[in-house]
A protein has these predicted regions:
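Active-site-adjacent pocket-lining segments in enzyme domains
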Residues: 1-101
Length: 101
């Protein structure tokens, strides 16, 4: 949907773009925080925070991105969210029209 709204989608969990930092995915919040600590303090500081949190993710399945998930799982989600995606896209397009974008 990002492409349809004029954005440039990327696969990065954390993306630094000029003065903006964004994170995607449910667990990316911790990754985002650690990256921010590294940028503001240092890598060693961020690693110490990671160690303190004992943040050592080991997901039980290797399906955390479209490239890694099996086709059946991708199609399952696509079908599940088809209506929501259509509504969200229509809402975003109406908002863009109101803003003159």
């Amino acid at each position: 949907m990002l492409k349809e709204l004029g954005a440039i989608p990327t696969r990065g969990r954390i993306v630094v773009d000029r003065n903006r930092i964004t994170g995607g995915g449910v667990t990316a919040g911790i990754d985002f925080g650690l990256k921010l600590v590294a940028l503001l303090k240092s890598r060693v500081y961020a690693e110490a925070v990671q160690l303190y949190l004992e943040y050592d993710p080991q997901p039980p399945f290797n399906a955390g991105s479209p490239e890694k998930a099996q086709p059946l799982a991708r199609q399952f989600l696509k079908d599940m969210f088809a209506g929501m995606r259509a509504n969200a896209l229509a809402t975003a397009k109406r908002a863009m029209q109101r803003l003159g974008a």
